[in-house]
Amino acid sequence: FNSNKCIGLSQGIYPNYTDIDSYNMAACCIDTAIRNLIVTGCDLSTVALLDNFCWSSPENSEKLYQLKMAAKACYDLSLAFETPFISGKDSMYNDFNGYDKRNRKIKISIPPTLLISSIGIIKSYNNLLTIVPHSIDDLVYIIGKTGNEIGGSEFAKIFTINNNKVPQVYKEIAKENYNCFSKANQNKLITSAISVGIGGLGIALSKMAIASRKGLKVNLSNINTIDKKID
């Protein structure tokens, strides 16, 4: 009870990505679960993961392949980030076989889904970060690059945009960014932070603005991008 340490818990889930690219779906789940902890002050070296696979029948060859690629991503990302899986839970055959109101045979299967949970340690509550900017003089920095990767997003669904590229995790770059972020936080260079996730940068900035009750002034014209053009 005399320790200054804190525990962080988070998760990542992107079921809409599975039918497009189950490997990068799983990679995004892992990266998000980790990144959500990093921005609270957790050090990457303390992070561990748990998986929860909820899948339809693997007797369907397509679903089995999606499962294989998702599991491969778990293996690859766990090694790349040096974040071990310490537990997990799998639920298979989530299918309904029955009849509709006209007595016709039907089969309803859940979207193949992976939930990644994460746990990490903040070495001291003095390094704990929230999403609330502390001062009207705070500067907003965006770490990392964005790309023309909106496949599986709500935006693409609403506006019927045909983009079959889901976000890709650049493991080495992400790991370096997370370690640099932690060093900056330990040196008291960061006052608040948020992880960009579902809804993208707009939602992340909106959350910070609402939390601060002051608003934010941002200019995204020079945002770093992976691709030359963002449609």
Task: Put a short name on every predicted segment.
Residues 1-148, 153-163:
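Glycine-rich phosphate/pyrophosphate-binding loop regions near the starts of catalytic domains
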Residues 132, 170, 194:
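Glycine- and other small-residue-rich loops at beta-strand/loop junctions that grip anionic moieties
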Residues 169-176:
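C-terminal transmembrane module of polytopic alpha-helical membrane proteins
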